[in-house]
Regions:
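FAD-binding core/adjacent interface of flavoenzyme oxidoreductases
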Residues: 1-4, 71-162, 169-173, 241
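Beta1-alpha1 glycine-rich phosphate/pyrophosphate-binding loop at the start
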Residues: 2-71, 153-193
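A Rossmann-like FAD-binding core segment of flavoenzymes
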Residues: 30, 69-81, 96, 171-263, ...
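FAD-site-proximal beta/loop scaffold in flavoenzymes
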Residues: 117-141, 234-239, 243-303, 310
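Short, electropositive alpha-helical surface patch
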Residues: 155-171, 297-304, 332-343
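Internal hydrophobic alpha-helix adjacent to the cofactor/substrate pocket in enzyme cavities
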Residues: 169, 300-326
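FAD-binding beta-loop-beta segment adjacent to the flavin cofactor pocket
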Residues: 263-280, 335-348, 352-353
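C-terminal auxiliary extensions adjacent to catalytic cores
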Residues: 341-381
């Protein structure tokens, strides 16, 4: 008898899992992907929209391509996850039972957690707001631009620093190169998960573009012209660009899968939750590696999605020994002018997490373009 495998979320993890499952399972097994959106767009695209090299409407790929592969797509919202009954409740399609569940719902942004941000600040991680940020920058004649990381952890750790360089370039080209750009972070270093050495390299890179890094500055409240931080510091600003606090979606927290925390704890190798037939992958999860947590990045979600799929295939009796998540990943750090650095990491290294940052090059930038291109091709066509 065929199994129904339900995947909540059509991001990196969900799409990777759905494709791996469909590739290896016969048609008697149903694979269902549910997402509120009917399209997929990588988060990295927001930087290209900010830069002006890409438009939002040209960056959204319809999920309809999954149907041609034999993957069912539900454009719906999950409102309850009942792990005891192995079922979910949805807004439009009612109750849906499952044999296996993969939770890949990502992280929820909570901009109103910082009083005054909504209405005064602009959300860098909301693709609908990014074109407006670009327009604001193009209209500036100078002034103070504040980029505030409002909570930890957050998706794609290098992104605020990449954005600061892009913003510096935009202002310089617009004749407002005398503007002051500050990045504020609650953390003691730029990218805590990557350690002090690599963080220092990141700070040095942005400083070459006139951007100042302000560690240990957790945003407390915002007014029309001022930022107040937990450490008592008050700063003036003209344009505030924020990376809001993140947490798992309410429906996940209400399910009990987070065990009272903000994130779903999972087995670091298998992606299994505390429920035998429920897996969780990507930004919705938390994996502790010593004193740090695995960063929230698309490459980790993708690899975890493949592992969850192979774990399920193994239980069904298909394939070799179930796969194990390696803790290895990489990302690109853009520095403008079609140049990008290449950051690789091994969080499960037996001697402790290890990192390497290759210097910026046009070749790495082309690799980033290809990163998007190949995944969209493989997942949605």
């Amino acid at each position: 008898m065929g199994k129904r495998i339900l995947i909540l979320g059509a991001g990196f993890g969900g799409l990777a899992a759905a494709n791996a499952l469909r590739k290896n399972l016969s048609a008697e097994h149903r694979i269902v992907v549910l997402d509120r959106k009917n399209w997929f767009m990588m988060g990295l695209v927001k930087l290209w929209i900010l830069e002006g090299s890409r438009k939002l409407e040209d960056s959204q790929t319809p999920l309809a391509g999954l149907s041609a592969k034999g993957i069912e797509v539900l454009n719906d919202e999950v409102i309850k996850i009942d792990t005891t009954a192995s079922a979910i409740e949805t807004r439009d399609n009612g109750k849906i039972e499952f044999d296996y569940l993969i939770v890949a719902l990502g992280a929820e942004l909570v901009p109103d957690r910082v009083p005054g941000f909504v209405g005064n600040g602009h959300n860098l991680y909301d693709p609908l707001q990014v074109p407006g940020i670009r327009e604001k920058l193009l209209s500036m004649n100078g002034g103070k631009v504040a980029i505030a990381i409002m909570g930890m952890p957050y998706k794609c750790p290098p992104a605020p620093y990449e954005a600061s360089i892009i913003i510096s370039n935009i202002l310089a080209r617009a004749g407002a190169g005398n503007s002051q750009i500050d990045v504020y972070s609650p953390a003691p270093m730029a990218i805590p998960a990557a350690g002090p050495k690599l963080s220092a390299t990141v700070v040095d890179t942005i400083s070459q573009h006139g951007v100042r890094f302000n560690p240990l500055h957790k945003l407390k409240s915002v007014t029309e012209s001022q930022l107040e931080f937990d450490n008592g510091v008050v700063k003036d600003y003209d344009l505030l660009i924020g990376i809001p606090p993140h947490r798992s979606p309410e429906v996940v927290r209400a399910s009990g899968l987070t065990a009272g925390s903000d994130w779903v704890p999972i087995d670091k190798h298998t992606t299994r939750t505390s429920i035998h037939n429920v897996f969780a992958v990507g930004d919705v999860t938390e994996i502790k590696v010593g004193a740090i947590a695995l960063p929230k990045a698309g490459i980790f979600a993708e690899e975890q999605g493949k592992v969850a799929a192979q774990q399920i295939l193994n239980e069904i009796g298909i394939g070799p020994t179930a796969a194990s998540f390696s803790g290895q990943g990489y990302c690109f750090m853009e520095v403008g002018n079609r140049q990008a650095g290449y950051l690789s990491a091994d969080f499960y290294n037996k001697d402790g997490p290890s990192f390497n940052l290759d210097p910026p090059s046009e070749e790495n930038y082309e690799k980033k373009l290809n990163f998007e291109r190949t995944r969209i091709r493989d997942w949605l066509f």
